[in-house]
Protein backbone atom coordinates (compact mmCIF):
# COMPACT_ATOMS: atom_id res chain seq x y z
CA UNK A 1 0.00 0.00 0.00
CA UNK A 2 1.33 3.44 -0.96
CA UNK A 3 1.98 5.75 2.00
CA UNK A 4 0.37 9.18 1.71
CA UNK A 5 2.82 11.88 2.81
CA UNK A 6 0.49 14.76 2.07
CA UNK A 7 -0.45 16.88 5.08
CA UNK A 8 -2.99 19.62 5.71
CA UNK A 9 -2.73 21.06 9.26
CA UNK A 10 -5.02 23.53 10.97
CA UNK A 11 -3.62 25.32 14.03
CA UNK A 12 -5.86 27.32 16.42
CA UNK A 13 -9.00 26.72 14.32
CA UNK A 14 -12.32 25.65 15.90
CA UNK A 15 -12.34 21.85 15.71
CA UNK A 16 -15.90 21.71 14.36
CA UNK A 17 -14.83 23.68 11.26
CA UNK A 18 -11.71 21.67 10.39
CA UNK A 19 -13.34 18.79 8.42
CA UNK A 20 -14.99 21.15 5.92
CA UNK A 21 -11.88 23.33 5.72
CA UNK A 22 -9.82 20.25 4.85
CA UNK A 23 -12.28 19.48 2.06
CA UNK A 24 -11.95 23.07 0.80
CA UNK A 25 -8.15 22.79 0.81
CA UNK A 26 -8.16 19.37 -0.87
CA UNK A 27 -10.54 20.69 -3.56
CA UNK A 28 -8.13 23.50 -4.45
CA UNK A 29 -5.11 21.19 -4.47
CA UNK A 30 -6.92 18.70 -6.70
CA UNK A 31 -8.17 21.39 -9.09
CA UNK A 32 -4.61 22.70 -9.44
CA UNK A 33 -3.23 19.16 -9.88
CA UNK A 34 -0.92 19.45 -6.85
CA UNK A 35 0.06 15.88 -5.99
CA UNK A 36 2.59 16.34 -3.16
CA UNK A 37 2.00 18.92 -0.46
CA UNK A 38 2.28 19.96 3.14
CA UNK A 39 0.25 23.01 4.05
CA UNK A 40 -0.23 24.59 7.46
CA UNK A 41 -3.12 26.95 8.15
CA UNK A 42 -2.52 29.03 11.27
CA UNK A 43 -5.17 31.24 12.83
CA UNK A 44 -3.67 34.33 14.43
CA UNK A 45 -4.82 37.59 15.98
CA UNK A 46 -4.72 40.94 14.21
CA UNK A 47 -1.49 41.96 15.91
CA UNK A 48 0.36 38.90 14.58
CA UNK A 49 -0.98 39.12 11.02
CA UNK A 50 -0.15 42.85 10.89
CA UNK A 51 3.39 42.02 12.03
CA UNK A 52 3.73 39.39 9.26
CA UNK A 53 2.28 41.74 6.64
CA UNK A 54 4.66 44.52 7.70
CA UNK A 55 7.75 42.30 7.82
CA UNK A 56 7.26 40.34 4.60
CA UNK A 57 5.13 42.58 2.39
CA UNK A 58 6.15 45.98 3.80
CA UNK A 59 2.47 46.85 4.25
CA UNK A 60 1.71 48.22 7.72
CA UNK A 61 -1.89 47.08 8.07
CA UNK A 62 -4.01 44.13 9.03
CA UNK A 63 -4.94 41.68 6.29
CA UNK A 64 -7.32 38.72 6.32
CA UNK A 65 -4.93 36.09 4.92
CA UNK A 66 -1.25 35.91 4.05
CA UNK A 67 0.49 32.98 2.34
CA UNK A 68 4.11 31.83 2.28
CA UNK A 69 5.40 29.17 -0.09
CA UNK A 70 8.26 27.70 1.96
CA UNK A 71 9.50 24.84 -0.28
CA UNK A 72 8.20 25.21 -3.87
CA UNK A 73 9.51 21.83 -5.08
CA UNK A 74 7.30 19.99 -2.60
CA UNK A 75 4.52 22.60 -2.40
CA UNK A 76 5.10 23.23 1.28
CA UNK A 77 3.63 26.40 2.69
CA UNK A 78 2.14 28.29 5.61
CA UNK A 79 -1.06 30.30 5.41
CA UNK A 80 -2.01 32.68 8.22
CA UNK A 81 -5.63 33.75 8.68
CA UNK A 82 -6.79 36.55 10.96
CA UNK A 83 -9.44 35.39 13.39
CA UNK A 84 -10.90 38.87 13.90
CA UNK A 85 -10.90 39.85 10.22
CA UNK A 86 -12.48 36.54 9.21
CA UNK A 87 -15.26 37.02 11.77
CA UNK A 88 -15.85 40.62 10.63
CA UNK A 89 -15.88 39.63 6.96
CA UNK A 90 -18.33 36.80 7.63
CA UNK A 91 -20.81 39.39 8.91
CA UNK A 92 -19.97 41.87 6.14
CA UNK A 93 -20.55 39.29 3.37
CA UNK A 94 -23.50 37.54 5.08
CA UNK A 95 -21.59 34.28 5.45
CA UNK A 96 -21.25 31.96 8.39
CA UNK A 97 -17.82 32.07 10.00
CA UNK A 98 -17.14 28.58 8.61
CA UNK A 99 -17.97 29.77 5.09
CA UNK A 100 -15.65 32.76 5.45
CA UNK A 101 -12.84 30.56 6.76
CA UNK A 102 -13.33 28.23 3.78
CA UNK A 103 -13.20 31.22 1.44
CA UNK A 104 -9.92 32.37 2.99
CA UNK A 105 -8.49 28.83 2.88
CA UNK A 106 -9.27 28.75 -0.85
CA UNK A 107 -7.84 32.24 -1.37
CA UNK A 108 -4.64 31.51 0.54
CA UNK A 109 -4.03 28.27 -1.33
CA UNK A 110 -4.60 29.90 -4.71
CA UNK A 111 -1.86 32.38 -3.79
CA UNK A 112 0.46 29.45 -3.07
CA UNK A 113 -0.47 28.08 -6.50
CA UNK A 114 0.73 31.30 -8.11
CA UNK A 115 -2.50 33.26 -8.47
CA UNK A 116 -2.28 36.98 -7.68
CA UNK A 117 -4.80 39.70 -7.00
CA UNK A 118 -2.56 42.76 -7.42
CA UNK A 119 -4.02 43.93 -10.74
CA UNK A 120 -7.48 43.80 -12.30
CA UNK A 121 -6.84 41.03 -14.83
CA UNK A 122 -5.19 38.62 -12.40
CA UNK A 123 -7.65 39.49 -9.64
CA UNK A 124 -10.57 38.60 -11.92
CA UNK A 125 -8.94 35.29 -12.84
CA UNK A 126 -8.21 34.45 -9.20
CA UNK A 127 -11.62 35.42 -7.84
CA UNK A 128 -13.43 33.56 -10.62
CA UNK A 129 -11.58 30.38 -9.67
CA UNK A 130 -12.08 31.06 -5.96
CA UNK A 131 -15.82 31.66 -6.32
CA UNK A 132 -16.26 28.54 -8.43
CA UNK A 133 -14.63 26.34 -5.78
CA UNK A 134 -16.55 28.06 -2.98
CA UNK A 135 -19.88 27.56 -4.75
CA UNK A 136 -19.10 23.88 -5.35
CA UNK A 137 -18.61 23.43 -1.61
CA UNK A 138 -21.63 25.36 -0.37
CA UNK A 139 -24.21 25.57 -3.14
CA UNK A 140 -24.42 22.14 -4.70
CA UNK A 141 -27.56 21.65 -6.76
UniProtKB/Swiss-Prot annotation:
GO biological process, one term: rRNA processing
Enzyme Commission code(s) on record: 3.1.-.-
Main location: cytoplasm
The UniProt record lists the keyword ATP-binding: no
Keyword match Lipid metabolism: no
Residues involved in Zn(2+) binding: 107, 111, 117
Record's keyword terms, sorted: Cytoplasm, Endonuclease, Hydrolase, Metal-binding, Nuclease, Ribosome biogenesis, rRNA processing, Zinc
Subcellular location field: Cytoplasm
MF GO annotations: metalloendopeptidase activity; RNA endonuclease activity; zinc ion binding
Cofactor note: Binds 1 zinc ion.
HAMAP family: Endoribonucl_YbeY
Sequence similarity: Belongs to the endoribonuclease YbeY family.
Role this protein plays: Single strand-specific metallo-endoribonuclease involved in late-stage 70S ribosome quality control and in maturation of the 3' terminus of the 16S rRNA.
Protein's name according to its UniProt entry: Endoribonuclease YbeY
Organism: Endomicrobium trichonymphae
Amino acid sequence: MKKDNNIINFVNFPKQHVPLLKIAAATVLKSEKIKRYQVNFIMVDDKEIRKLNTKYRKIKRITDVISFLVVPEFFMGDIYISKTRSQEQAKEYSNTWQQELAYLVIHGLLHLCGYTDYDAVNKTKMFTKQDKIFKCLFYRL
